[in-house]
């Protein structure tokens, strides 16, 4: 990448740890120097030298309307003119709450936060307060933010108490977290048989978007719902990535499962800093000031994010919106898959709604990965080569083999064809080099 980016990265490292404010941005997984972006519009982002890239990161999901959508920008400007934040209730947060509760059947009440991490952290505290239990269950490869309870991996045995995955997380704290393999119904049954009456909640990405993209089996979700109901545990769907991305009603509608609590991310504010958690009324009424579970935030429900979200939902609720985005994903993924086959590249893919995943497997017998171990067994070197080849051709993918891709309504057929052509060129080079 250009000397300009190297200079900017060096400058950033002077006062920002690692030069970034979120680790994946550092390109550690793919190597090289991160590209410093300057502006964005529609399906494109532009670096500091005004080079154009077709963007499939979309600020990690929320830009489903594309960047700088005129309606959203107009709403944000109007909100800013009226004052950035009040520290009081506003009608705008009520409007967003009404919209979400009207759309998502499992959400009877909802509380705004300022991030997805706050949403998952608060949902877990609420589940513990509601049940009077301490233990929580999560799954390998699922990411739910950086709160201490969730930076935990499985112990030496599948049903062992968890071990911290980050320095600074006390082992005594991590012992309350049980980590299971994703997409494994039997592991859920075994866990509840051993710990059932101690489990406060199970938190899960209903479709995993942090080990690339894994769409689990229906049996996995049916088992989760049945075991949580039987064991009196709260089922939490973390739809920070999938909410309003795979469909208007999220992944829960795809599987026909109603969780007890659900977490949303910045998509509900059209990309501004915001999150939310909601669910059954009897659980949500345990939150202060109604109940004894404390949760608060000075900027929760801030007017900029709320008014941006209201503007965004006007488009999301138009009939056919999600079908249009899904058609774009299908066109792109099928085109890339055909190009890979043409050049003998062993590529597997997944897709649903506005999300897609690409996996470079090591042999023809290997199918689409179904869990974290199978994702880690993929050919990361080939992904890294593919990533940089696409970047050099003006295609911006997530700089990690463990991240999902996102489509927007603003991606054109020309964008998709250019992306497929770039992939074809990169695959040709990869094939010639092997």
Swiss-Prot record:
Looking at the keywords, is Iron present? Answer: no
Residues bearing N6-(pyridoxal phosphate)lysine are: 266
Question: What PROSITE patterns does the annotation carry?
Answer: AA_TRANSFER_CLASS_3
Localisation: Cytoplasm
Q: Name one GO molecular function term.
A: glutamate-1-semialdehyde 2,1-aminomutase activity
Cofactor requirements of the protein: pyridoxal 5'-phosphate
What the entry lists under Gene3D superfamilies is as follows: Aspartate Aminotransferase, domain 1, Type I PLP-dependent aspartate aminotransferase-like (Major domain)
Q: Which reaction does it catalyse?
A: (S)-4-amino-5-oxopentanoate = 5-aminolevulinate
One cellular component GO annotation, for this chain's record? Answer: cytoplasm
Report the EC number(s), separated by commas if there are several: 5.4.3.8
Chief localization class?
cytoplasm
* Domain of life from the UniProt record: Bacteria
Give the record's keywords alphabetically.
Cytoplasm, Isomerase, Porphyrin biosynthesis, Pyridoxal phosphate
Q: In which pathway does it act?
A: Porphyrin-containing compound metabolism; protoporphyrin-IX biosynthesis; 5-aminolevulinate from L-glutamyl-tRNA(Glu): step 2/2
What does the record list as GO biological process? protoporphyrinogen IX biosynthetic process
SUPFAM superfamilies registered for this protein in UniProt: PLP-dependent transferases (SSF53383)
Main EC class the enzyme belongs to = isomerase
Pfam hit, one: Aminotran_3
How does this polypeptide assemble, per the annotation? Homodimer.
Q: Can you tell me which family this protein belongs to?
A: Belongs to the class-III pyridoxal-phosphate-dependent aminotransferase family. HemL subfamily.
State the protein's name: Glutamate-1-semialdehyde 2,1-aminomutase
Lineage runs: Bacteria, Pseudomonadati, Pseudomonadota, Gammaproteobacteria, Moraxellales
């Amino acid at each position: 990448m250009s000397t300009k980016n190297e200079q900017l990265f060096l400058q950033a490292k002077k006062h920002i740890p690692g030069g970034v404010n979120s680790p994946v941005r550092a390109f550690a997984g793919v190597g090289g120097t991160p590209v410093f972006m300057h502006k964005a519009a529609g399906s494109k982002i532009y670096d500091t030298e005004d080079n154009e890239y077709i963007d499939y990161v979309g600020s990690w999901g929320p830009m489903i309307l594309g960047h700088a959508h005129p309606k959203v920008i107009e709403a944000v400007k109007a909100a800013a003119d009226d004052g950035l934040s009040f520290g009081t209730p506003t009608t705008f947060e009520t409007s967003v709450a009404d919209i979400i509760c009207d759309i998502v059947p499992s959400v009877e009440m909802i509380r705004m936060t300022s991030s997805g991490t706050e949403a998952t952290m608060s949902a877990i505290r609420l589940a513990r307060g509601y049940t009077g239990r301490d233990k929580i269950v999560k799954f390998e490869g699922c990411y739910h933010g950086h709160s201490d309870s969730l930076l935990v991996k499985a112990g030496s045995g599948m049903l062992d108490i968890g071990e911290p995955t980050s320095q600074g997380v006390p082992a005594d704290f991590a012992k309350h977290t049980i980590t299971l393999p994703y997409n494994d119904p039997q592991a859920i049954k075994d866990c509840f048989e051993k710990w059932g009456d101690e489990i406060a909640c199970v938190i899960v990405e209903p479709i995993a978007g942090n080990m690339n993209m894994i769409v689990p089996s229906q049996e996995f979700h049916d088992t989760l719902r049945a075991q949580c109901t039987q064991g009196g545990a709260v089922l939490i769907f973390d739809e920070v990535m999938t909410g309003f991305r795979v469909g208007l009603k999220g992944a829960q509608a795809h599987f026909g499962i109603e969780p007890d609590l659900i977490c949303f991310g910045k998509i509900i504010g059209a990309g501004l800093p915001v999150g939310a958690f909601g669910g059954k009324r009897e659980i949500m009424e345990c939150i202060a000031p109604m109940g004894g579970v404390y949760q608060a935030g000075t900027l929760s429900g801030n007017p900029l994010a709320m008014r941006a979200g209201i503007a965004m939902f006007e488009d999301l609720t138009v009939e056919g919106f999600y079908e249009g985005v899904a058609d774009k994903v299908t066109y792109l993924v099928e085109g890339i898959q055909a190009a890979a086959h043409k050049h003998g590249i062993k590529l597997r893919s997944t897709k649903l709604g506005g999300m897609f995943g690409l996996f470079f497997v090591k042999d023809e017998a290997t199918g689409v990965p179904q869990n974290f171990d199978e994702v880690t067994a993929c050919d990361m070197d080939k992904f890294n080569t593919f990533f940089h080849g696409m970047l050099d051709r003006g295609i911006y993918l997530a700089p990690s083999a463990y991240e999902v891709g996102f489509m927007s309504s603003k991606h054109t057929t020309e964008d998709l064809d250019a992306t497929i052509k770039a992939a074809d060129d990169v695959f040709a080079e990869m094939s010639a080099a092997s």
